[in-house]
């Protein structure tokens, strides 16, 4: 059985969140279906999710959760080696509503169940209701027989931070200090929450993310740890790029930062697409009051940074852009001992996310 842990934190109990580059037991996804977020009733994006899941399963066992209505369709589209569970949900962003797993030095694992409010709640959230998404982390922990910590007084999404597993967390001011999440907490109080529940000693703050309308600037589109003391950061010198200012600011900040161990960060550049990815065929997306509308010509958050590191592989977004191959080469340089797999995720970015957003790794115990 899985129980809730009250009156304590992972830090007090000797649990830490490992870096994404550390060994993984499995990866989780949620099957997409919302017709008010995905084109053509979700059919094109289901193909993209399937391709992402297949790519990951080359390196790590895959679990996919899906609503009752879509169970048979999901099961038919995914190969038999991928496990499928029925689970109610509001949408498909398991990085943000799923558990952040923490481990200790004795082979034990627990989950952190952050309060989820659809990226801003009633202030600027993307949809309502979000109650089923807020239960996903607890349900996954139940399936895995993993005890969990619930942060009832603290809203956070998994895509808003990256850890190095050695005491450092990377995040953005735009997201964590936004009005729709924890307006009752100071920046210092938010830092303390991160330290307590991720078991870190140092918080590295970037400024803005590149998606103010979607997630208020999640860091996983901008930068991530690729190894202890090493980070990747999006980079462009094209001043016409919608990502230029945020990318330049993040890169310059990272160059001056040290981690919790006192190491000067080594910063690797990762290119941006040459052309903007813009929404096409928005008439194929149902309009529903209370859900963020999507219009033709809207610029999507097409970042190569939103990749997933998983055991011996790295799964990287592709957009049919002339920089696709360069991005794969740059990621290969960052991970010389891993296989780099590109997957076209245009349909995913139409809905507001990417590979890292739709996956959640479970570390080895």
From Swiss-Prot:
One of the GO biological process terms: putrescine biosynthetic process
Top-rank taxon, per record: Bacteria
InterPro entries for the chain: Agmatine_deiminase (IPR017754), Peptidyl-Arg-deiminase_porph (IPR007466)
Top EC category: hydrolase
Record-linked SUPFAM superfamilies: Pentein
Molecular function terms, GO-annotated: agmatine deiminase activity; protein-arginine deiminase activity
Family under the similarity heading: Belongs to the agmatine deiminase family.
Name of this chain's protein: Putative agmatine deiminase
Native species: Enterococcus faecalis (strain ATCC 700802 / V583)
Lineage summary: Bacteria, Bacillati, Bacillota, Bacilli, Lactobacillales
């Amino acid at each position: 059985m899985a129980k809730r842990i009250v009156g304590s934190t992972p830090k007090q109990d000797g649990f830490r969140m490992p870096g994404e580059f550390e060994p993984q037991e499995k990866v989780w996804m949620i099957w997409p279906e919302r017709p008010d977020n995905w084109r053509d009733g979700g059919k094109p994006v289901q193909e993209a999710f399937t391709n992402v899941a297949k790519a990951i399963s080359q390196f790590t066992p895959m679990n996919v959760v899906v609503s009752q209505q879509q169970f048979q369709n999901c099961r038919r589209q995914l190969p038999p080696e991928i496990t499928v569970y029925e689970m109610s949900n509001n949408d498909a962003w398991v990085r943000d509503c799923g558990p952040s797993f923490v481990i200790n030095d004795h082979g034990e694992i627990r989950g952190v169940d952050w309060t989820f409010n659809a990226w801003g709640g009633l202030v600027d959230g993307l949809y309502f209701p979000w109650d089923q998404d807020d239960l996903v982390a607890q349900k996954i922990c139940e399936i895995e027989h993993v005890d969990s910590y619930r942060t009832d007084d603290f809203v956070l999404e998994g895509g808003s931070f990256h850890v190095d597993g050695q005491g450092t967390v990377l995040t953005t001011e735009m997201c964590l200090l936004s009005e729709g999440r924890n307006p009752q907490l100071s920046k210092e109080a938010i830092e303390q929450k991160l330290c307590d529940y991720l078991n870190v000693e140092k918080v590295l703050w970037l400024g803005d993310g590149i998606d103010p309308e979607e997630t208020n600037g999640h860091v996983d589109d901008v930068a991530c740890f690729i190894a202890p003391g090493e980070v990747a950061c999006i980079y462009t010198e094209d001043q016409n790029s919608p990502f230029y200012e945020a990318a330049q600011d993040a890169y310059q900040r990272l160059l001056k930062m040290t981690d919790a161990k006192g190491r000067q960060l080594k910063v690797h550049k990762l290119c941006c697409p040459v052309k903007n990815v813009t929404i096409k065929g928005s008439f194929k997306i149902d309009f529903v009051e209370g859900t963020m509308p999507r219009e033709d010509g809207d610029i999507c958050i097409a970042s190569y940074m939103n990749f997933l590191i998983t055991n011996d592989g790295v799964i990287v977004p592709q957009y049919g852009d002339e920089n696709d191959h360069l991005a794969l080469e740059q990621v290969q340089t960052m991970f010389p001992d891993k296989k780099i797999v590109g997957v076209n995720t245009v349909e995913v970015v139409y809905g507001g996310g990417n590979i890292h957003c739709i996956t959640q790794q479970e570390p080895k115990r």
